């Protein structure tokens, strides 16, 4: 049996009830083009490969690639790419698929946020994503205004995706047992963005300024870009803090900000 590698964040799903629930939430179909991030020992890979016509798995650990390729329970419709997902040219990778894809995986906690940000650049090639991630990260992604977890990642992810939590998962569902709890989330790209169009690069600058000083009032945290009078002009109370603004508020502000070079 494969010994988990700690530096790769390997914690393998073992709870059969949880595995079944996850597969039911993903609800794979025969014609789906499916991508799995980090198949591990194949807890999800094996049952989904029996349903879907095509599944591409990305796995950094060459020993797991060997294990999966030799597994007699996996059909020959599985294509495994042995590479670090963080080093994969995603634009080139997604362009190899004629149709939009579905993505799932139990993400290593140390790369989950960075990886999801990388997917944003190709969100128009994605049907949906189902990820098992650290519960704390899920809370940050899902958080709404006036919530202590609401921040940069909440605004950016919700600008591009409809996000929802499906279930919480006990750490006992994994082997070895991690120190943190997990959640299964679903992310679907907006077919029509519910927020005003905005210059996303400007919004990122604005969000970093606001949330890096989240306990400060907006009149102080955003003073580099807006006067108090300007903030009021956009129908925002300058005494509010970063966590009090809606995504629409941030869109409107970013569309009117001037970044001095």
Curated annotation (Swiss-Prot):
Pfam families: RrnaAD. Its EC number is 2.1.1.182. SUPFAM superfamilies: S-adenosyl-L-methionine-dependent methyltransferases (SSF53335). It catalyses: adenosine(1518)/adenosine(1519) in 16S rRNA + 4 S-adenosyl-L-methionine = N(6)-dimethyladenosine(1518)/N(6)-dimethyladenosine(1519) in 16S rRNA + 4 S-adenosyl-L-homocysteine + 4 H(+). GO terms for molecular function: 16S rRNA (adenine(1518)-N(6)/adenine(1519)-N(6))-dimethyltransferase activity; RNA binding. The keyword Mitochondrion does not apply. Keywords: Cytoplasm, Methyltransferase, RNA-binding, rRNA processing, S-adenosyl-L-methionine, Transferase. The keyword Repeat does not apply. Gene3D superfamilies: Ribosomal RNA adenine dimethylase-like, domain 2 (1.10.8.100), Vaccinia Virus protein VP39 (3.40.50.150). PROSITE patterns: RRNA_A_DIMETH, SAM_RNA_A_N6_MT. GO terms for cellular component: cytosol. S-adenosyl-L-methionine binds at residues 11, 13, 38, 59, 84, 106. Coiled coil: none annotated. It is found in: Cytoplasm. Its main location: cytoplasm. Specifically dimethylates two adjacent adenosines (A1518 and A1519) in the loop of a conserved hairpin near the 3'-end of 16S rRNA in the 30S particle. May play a critical role in biogenesis of 30S subunits. HAMAP family: 16SrRNA_methyltr_A. Belongs to the class I-like SAM-binding methyltransferase superfamily. rRNA adenine N(6)-methyltransferase family. RsmA subfamily. This is Ribosomal RNA small subunit methyltransferase A. It comes from Wigglesworthia glossinidia brevipalpis.
